[in-house]
Amino acid sequence: MLASGLLLAALLACLTVMILLSVWRQRKLWGKLPPGPTPLPFIGNYLQLNTEQMYDSLMKIRDRYGPVFTIHLGPRRIVVLCGQEAVKEALVDQAEDFSGRGEQATFDWLFKGYGVAFSTWERARPLRRFAISTLRDFGVGKRGIEERIQEEAGFLIEAFRDTRGAFIDPTFFLSRTVSNVISSIVFGDRFDYEDKEFLSLLRMMLGSFQFTATPTGQLYEMFYSVMKHLPGPQQQAFKELEGLRDFIAKKVERNQRTLDPNSPRDFIDSFLIRMQEEKKDPKSEFHMKNLVLTTLNLFFAGTETVSTTMRYGFLLLMKHPDVEAKVHEEIDRVIGRNRQPKFEDRAKMPYTEAVIHEIQRFTDMIPMGLARRVTRDTKFRDFLLPKGTEVFPMLGSVLKDPKFFSKPREFYPQHFLDEKGQFKKSDAFMPFSVGKRYCLGEGLARMELFLFFTTIMQNFRFRSQQAPQDIDVSPKHVGFATIPRTYTMSFVPR
């Protein structure tokens, strides 16, 4: 009995020594990484993090260790960059070093390193170049896409008028409208607002996007190697992503059957033509998997981020009726009520422009940014980041950097106005990220936000069932994404 007890004690002692040696070796190997809390085997720094408030948890660690620190999400080792200076220094000044793509576990379950958004820089570079060029060919940045947005805005105005002032949830009104703009580019046509398949797709996008912001979604980011095999909300997110992929694949099959290489109808046609041109190149990135998943990247990003920003923006304007009134006054003075807004009106509407920028800043749609990865051993400040190190560029910490924004936690359009009331740019305005992997749809999103907001506000006043002081503008979830609370509102004709 005594011998077995001694043997057990010896085994436990050996195990403890092995764990301590493992941690010591890791710390030695990572000796030039930024400081951070000591991780435990497998669970990393889980005990120091609150998955319900992941962003705030990371900011508390920043307060202790500084703007550049190391954190372990389960077994994942990540360097976190906070504030405008650190993020710009990495993504702009050392853009090539930080151009790799880190993990986003929920989406990686489907994409597995393919498509333009979640792939390595080597794969993403030709796909980005092609996507930007093709979007331009189909009118992005030109008068053609502006007319398409104006047309879609007209459909939305009629849909709001049909509600006759009833209190409604604006979620799918907005996502249908925004999605139809990118759909006209990637699929060559818009959907009818009552199309059941279309509404199903929008629910799939919203569901999977919201999952990434939930506590379970944050837990999945840490322990996906185990959780992907277990029941739970992550399985529903996988089904939704699969459903979206299958829909895109059917669209591609349809285009293949009717393709005219001399007359591309949409993004899918253009990609198919490029595939034919490079079919003899074994290293070409223009193949079926990248076609389906790049199209899904464009469809998803072109729908969910802008529509969610607008939905959050409406809530903020109901909370701040004085801001809404000033926007109405500027619209009436510059545009009037008898014509649709144009993108060129933006130059004469500094207050409206400031409000839209402040909505984007305050809503902070992707607070932790899309994870990056250093492409080689990289010296950053006083640290050495080994090749392959994951990096979180905390865009939320840039958009709330007190060095640039006097009231970072408040909705305050004056952040973007000078003393003369003219629009003022900010070096810390990075909702689309920066560097080599900035959002390739930035130009389209800016045009959509301005034209949709001004057209809606030209025609309607917003009414809440709550008094302004009772409206809660804190987010429902903050994780990979920021998700506003569900609410109802009335669109009152002006």
Curated annotation (Swiss-Prot):
Substitution effect: residue 120 to S: No effect. Almost as active as CYP2A10 in coumarin hydroxylation and approximately half as active as CYP2A10 in androstenedione formation
Cofactor(s) named in the record: heme
Keywords for the protein's UniProt record, in alphabetical order: Acetylation, Endoplasmic reticulum, Heme, Iron, Membrane, Metal-binding, Microsome, Monooxygenase, Oxidoreductase
Main location: endoplasmic reticulum
Tissues where the protein occurs: Expressed in liver and lung as well as in nasal tissues.
Residues engaged in binding heme: 439
GO MF terms, alphabetically ordered: arachidonate epoxygenase activity; heme binding; iron ion binding; oxidoreductase activity, acting on paired donors, with incorporation or reduction of molecular oxygen, reduced flavin or flavoprotein as one donor, and incorporation of one atom of oxygen
CDD domains the record matches: CYP2A
EC number: 1.14.14.1
Transmembrane segments: none
Highest rank taxon of the organism: Eukaryota
Residues with PTM N6-acetyllysine: 379
Recorded catalytic activity of this chain's protein: an organic molecule + reduced [NADPH--hemoprotein reductase] + O2 = an alcohol + oxidized [NADPH--hemoprotein reductase] + H2O + H(+)
Compartments (UniProt record): Endoplasmic reticulum membrane; Microsome membrane
Record has Iron as a keyword: yes
PANTHER family, A to Z: CYTOCHROME P450 2A6, CYTOCHROME P450 508A4-RELATED
Role, per record: Catalyzes the oxygenation of a variety of substrates, including ethanol and procarcinogens such as N-nitrosodiethylamine and phenacetin. Has no or little activity as a coumarin 7-hydroxylase and in the formation of androstenedione from testosterone.
Listed name of the protein: Cytochrome P450 2A11
Organism of origin: Oryctolagus cuniculus (Rabbit)
